[in-house]
Structures are given as structure tokens and as C-alpha cells.
Amino acid sequence: MGKLQDWSITTCLFLFFLHASQTHCTSQSHVRNRLYRSKRGIGSSIDTSHLNAIRRLSVSLSLQNISGVNQQEQKERDLIENLPGQPSVNFKQYGGYVTVNESAGRSLYYYFVEATNTKNSSPLVLWLNGGPGCSSLYGAFQELGPFRVHSDNKTLYTNPYSWNNVANMLFLESPAGTGFSYTNTTTDMENPGDMKTAADNYVFLVKWLERFPEYKGRDFYIAGESYAGHYVQWRHGCGDFGDSYNVRTEDDESNGCYGMASVV
């Protein structure tokens, strides 16, 4: 009885959060348009400092305290056997946290679904929704993920057009404060910015690949929509990331990010 009650609570929280995410996302295009108008103003210039920050990030920062974590055990804990009301599928899915800043207590939540049938050869795609602050779970369950929500708001059905038909999909809740991602430091919420978001995304990827090392060496793409068009540009700082993790690129086919895309 207690387990059934826990699932009921989980289902309610999931559906409430999905509805809240959808409501929030309806305004992201307005935020994006205001930003573009301000950038086109007289004397204005686009801030690219976050790209330089990514280049300065070291792997030693990315791997802080990672040696004390058994990544294989953490991966097993992240395994999602079944979502509430989901149909039977032939791929695995995972959800969990990756700490990107130990001292601040800042952790990002991810939802990962393997490619159907071809997980061992398909590329890895990182998906980011816009906002800023729009949950990538909205993208996962309303746009390009493997499931959609039935009209009864209680069960799921498979999405025949899911991107995981051709790729391993990694949905990231970023920046901290978005969706299930959180921080224990108040100033993180008071002083957000693209530079901090890009740096956290970089650290997340380095640590995530320690948890899922089988995806090192894969073709790697970054994709997103709306304001995420600003985030995906941190691919220019992925050279150091690729050097350490042998992720294929479009530049030299051995390091960094293989491609990027932004959907308006």
C-alpha cells in the first residue's frame, strides 16, 4: 500500500511539474525577442565572455571530488525501470543528478534515453530548452522525447517521431533552478548568467561521461530551442573537453562537438 501511495505522489508531482513547465515555456519566445531587440540597439554588442570562460575551464575543476564517487553504482541508481503509466519499450532510460559545484551545492538534473536498437553506434545528443529556465523535460515529454502524455493525464504513449529513434538523447535541466536542478547557495539564483550556465554545462558533461564512459568517442551534437541558441554556442569551448574525452568533432573528427543546432 505504501509503495502504491509513493507512486501516486510521484505521478502527481510529475504531471504538475510538466504542466508548470509548459506554462512557463509559452513566454520564452517573448524573452528571446526582447533580448534580440536589445542586442540590435545602438552601441550594443553581444557578450561572448562565457565562451572564453569555457576555454579557461580545466579538467581538474570538472573532476573535483569525482574520485570519491563510484560512478557505476551511481549509474545503476539512476536507472528508471518504468515511468508511471508508460508502455513497454526496448531501451533503457536514466534520471539523476550530477554535482557541478561541490562548494555551492549546485547540481543539475538529467534525463537520458538510449537509442532504440542502435545505442552502441548512434550519436550522443545533448538537448537544452530555452527560457532561460524552461525545463528540458518539456522538450522530452511534449516535443522530441520517447513518450507523450495521454489526455487522461495519467498514462504515457510512445512518440513515433522521437529523436531516440536515431540518437542517444540527453536532456539537461539547466541552469540551476530550472526544473529539478538546484543550488544550495542563494547568490546563484540572484546572480545568474550565460557564463555560469555554460561553465556548469561543461562540468556536467565531463562528469556525466565518467558515469557513462561507453559514450566517450561517439559523435556528439548539442541541440536546443529558443534561448538555448545562446547556450549551444559554448561548443566553441569544447576543444579541451574533446581532447580529454575523445568526442568526435566536425572540425578535426577527434575532439569536442561534432555539430550544433538551434530551433527557434
Curated annotation (Swiss-Prot):
Q: Which domain of life is it from?
A: Eukaryota
From which residue to which does the signal peptide run? Answer: 1-23
Q: Which InterPro entries match?
A: AB_hydrolase_fold (IPR029058), Peptidase_S10 (IPR001563), Ser_caboxypep_ser_AS (IPR018202)
- Keywords on record: Glycoprotein, Secreted, Signal
State whether keyword Zinc-finger applies: no
Per the similarity annotation, which family is this?
A: Belongs to the peptidase S10 family.
Against PANTHER family, the record matches this protein to: SERINE CARBOXYPEPTIDASE-LIKE 36-RELATED, SERINE PROTEASE FAMILY S10 SERINE CARBOXYPEPTIDASE
GO CC annotations, alphabetized: extracellular region
Protein name stated in the entry: Putative serine carboxypeptidase-like 53
The glycosylation sites are 65, 101, 153, 184
Q: Which organism is it from?
A: Arabidopsis thaliana
Q: Which GO terms describe its biological process?
A: proteolysis
Subcellular location per the Swiss-Prot or TrEMBL entry: Secreted
Just give the chief location class.
Answer: secreted
Any one GO MF term held by the record is:
serine-type carboxypeptidase activity
